Amino acid sequence: MKTIIKILYLLCLPSLLLAADKPDLFLLKTYDETKSVVGWVMSEKLDGIRGFWDGKQLLTRGGKRIMAPDWFIENYPPFAIDGELWTKRADFEGISSIVRRKNPDERWRKITHQIFEVPNQQGGLLDRLAVLRDYLKMRVDSPIKIIKQYPINQRHQVKRFLQNIVRKGGEGVVVRNPNTAYQTGRLSSALKVKQYLDTECVIEEILPGKGKYTGKMGALLCKTKKGVLVKIGSGFKDIQRENPPPIGTTITFKYFGLTKKGKPKYPVFLRIRLVR
């Protein structure tokens, strides 16, 4: 599942100007460690921009047309493929700056289309991916790449794989049931696994809410020990939005790595630090 911040960011991309029908895609649920996924497959969860090729054009998750160069999509298949437009780990801002342009430039040569699904094909996940693999055999220079799927033979493999990905600067892991036919919506057979970090900050300002949070707290503006300002708008219960902790309170929040500017990514409130 994409985070709220990322979704809003994508909706505001000025270059994705041409609307199409919103594609019916599959979405990830969150992995529960109590669930056995032995017999499933796992892959790295790439932090890029989702790109859905419907057989004729490249679209965002929300149905906006992505203005990719003609040379980039000239050898795309006549059938649908789904994946992430990606360059390298920890480069979401860089990817966005390339993809959002109305007039695409040469920086698109840094982009690959990392595919995790071939919709509407017969069989399980690996069978569907094999359809694309056969198509790419004579197209070795294609920007289309298939994300490698690793079999899960023992439960501990998921944790070790996640730790290895995070050490390399990756976002997380996706585990999927390879025997399931293609489906859309939020699936119990496709799960995201993330490893988060946490730290403390002091509340500097209480920001008012909008929409359903009108009259309540919308977010907290906090400062970390390193002097970094962080806006935290998720993770709160309704009662906490009605009665937010006062300015000067120290809270703990979780986040998923750092941006290039050193800001915590996707901060989520965890708890108020108890005075001991």
Q: Where on the chain are the PLM-derived regions?
A:
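Intrinsically disordered, low-complexity boundary segments flanking structured domains
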Residues: C12, L27-T30, I66-N75, I81, ...
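N-terminal signal peptide c-region/cleavage motif recognized by signal peptidases
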Residues: P14-L16
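Covalent nucleotidyltransferase
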Residues: D21, D32-D141
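Nucleic-acid 5′ end/cap handling module spanning
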Residues: K22-R61, V118, K145-K263, P267-V275
